[in-house]
């Protein structure tokens, strides 16, 4: 008897991560991508009736909810929109998805406080609107019996028009010999989007539930990461200057040390997370 091929719904089509998620989902099952104005099926996730119809008609086995507002400063300047994008969409999905389905929510490392990392999953304390609305989204998602909330930070080449990753920013500016400032006081544990996407589906297939950090082992400063990216692609770092994040006036507050403790991930996945070097 053949195993059932899962029907997979990926939200957030048109986002930075979506092409990688869709490619990984396509290996695992039959995938449908949705966005507000793009994707296989258009759906306004803020409209609960549209979400109900989508989930009823598609009847997915697995859902990866990757849609949301990720601009930290944009969220701070428009908290209502941030709440709608990061909490209300999650609520509409979680409360209308049948209980036998599995649900993964792409959250953020910005839920952690401005303390020294690496952060364990229980160490929550967001200091900006983005982190608070994503954490609210986690809370409602986790009311679904088969849910995972994935806290992460991404890198990798953007495959989405008009969307740029941090390493894209570094490479494109240095290739044009434009000066960039890399922060020495910000630390993180980014993971490549292709690797992350595979892990999302490994966790769903393995019936993992709860909150989990997915990131690189150990992590590093954004300054060091930017220099490593430049070295990897062979561009000159002459235009690089170094600074601290607090030198920029008017930005939303951000946690300085976003390094992730990936012990639970290694236990849940059964393998050691990669380092950045």
Predicted region positions:
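NAD(P)H-binding glycine-rich loop region in Rossmannoid oxidoreductase-like domains
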Residues: 45-85
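NAD(P)-cofactor binding segment of oxidoreductase domains
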Residues: 77-104, 135-140
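NAD(P)-dependent short-chain dehydrogenase/reductase
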Residues: 139-188, 195
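Conserved Rossmann-fold NAD(P)-dependent oxidoreductase catalytic core, especially the SDR/UDP-sugar
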Residues: 91-127
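Mid/C-terminal beta-alpha module of Rossmann-like enzyme folds, strongest
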Residues: 197-199, 206-251
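Conserved C-terminal active-site "lid" loop/helix of NAD(P)H-dependent oxidoreductases
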Residues: 221-227, 243-277
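N-terminal Rossmann NAD(P)H-binding glycine-rich loop of SDR-like oxidoreductase domains
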Residues: 5-27
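Adenosine-cofactor binding site in Rossmann-like domains, unifying the SAM/SAH pocket
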Residues: 32-51
């Amino acid at each position: 008897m053949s195993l059932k091929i899962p029907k997979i719904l990926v939200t957030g089509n048109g986002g930075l991560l979506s092409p990688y998620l869709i490619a990984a989902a396509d290996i695992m099952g039959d995938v449908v991508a949705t966005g507000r104005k793009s994707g296989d099926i258009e759906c306004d996730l803020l409209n609960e009736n549209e979400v109900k119809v989508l989930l009823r008609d598609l009847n997915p086995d697995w859902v990866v909810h990757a849609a949301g507002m990720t601009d930290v400063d944009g969220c701070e300047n428009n908290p209502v929109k941030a709440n709608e994008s990061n909490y209300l969409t999650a609520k509409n999905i979680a409360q209308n998805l049948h209980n036998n389905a599995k649900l993964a929510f792409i959250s953020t490392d910005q839920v952690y406080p401005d303390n020294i990392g690496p952060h364990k999953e229980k160490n929550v304390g967001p200091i900006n609107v983005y982190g608070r609305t994503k954490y609210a989204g986690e809370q409602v998602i986790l009311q679904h019996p088969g849910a995972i909330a994935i806290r992460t930070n991404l890198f990798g080449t953007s495959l989405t028009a008009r969307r740029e990753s941090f390493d894209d920013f570094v490479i494109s500016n240095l290739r044009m010999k434009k000066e960039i400032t890399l922060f020495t006081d910000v630390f993180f544990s980014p993971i490549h989007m292709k690797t992350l996407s595979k892990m999302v589906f490994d966790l769903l297939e393995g019936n993992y539930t709860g909150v989990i950090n997915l990131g690189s082992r150990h992590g590093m400063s954004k300054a060091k990461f930017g220099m490593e990216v430049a070295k990897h692609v062979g561009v000159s770092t002459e235009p690089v200057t170094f600074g601290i994040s607090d030198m920029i006036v008017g930005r939303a507050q951000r946690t300085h040390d976003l390094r992730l403790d990936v012990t639970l991930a290694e236990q849940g996945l059964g393998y050691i997370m990669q380092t950045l070097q």
